[in-house]
């Protein structure tokens, strides 16, 4: 569980797996054609300084479409820092890790198993007991984020063919997902719009 394995915020990847940093910067038109996404280990779905709708929303949508089509790609975020800057109110990437663990190996394992969180503050943990999904929110104390009461959060569970919206206290039977085996969980404040997205959780494989 998360309390036994503390979550680490990644500040830099070092010698990282192969990353697709979505080339949609506002002032620069980088374009490329990728025919084999199996070569990519993760996609930077948020670059914090970039505009939400013009850039980052496209990154989120691309990642969702690839994952739900069966690609094993993790989600991360970034911040193009060229000096001192506040990270208050921005997304960060979190992974599970041990206090004295090998961070490089833990990052590699998290990436290759899609076990990353991209969040502004609260982390959404999803539990699968073999019959239903249930949920826990962990507040990280991240600077710039003011926690809400649990009932003010909404969760979406997106599959290839459906979108289920629920609350943190709900249990969602696995039979709700019909034939879908891949689920993307996200946590929102009050309303399930991208402006209110506070956490993208690890992909669930049933």
Where does each model-flagged region fall?
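Domain-core and long-helix interface of multi-subunit machines
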Residues: 1-89, 130-131, 135, 156-157, ...
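C-terminal functional module detector
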Residues: 69-74, 79-206
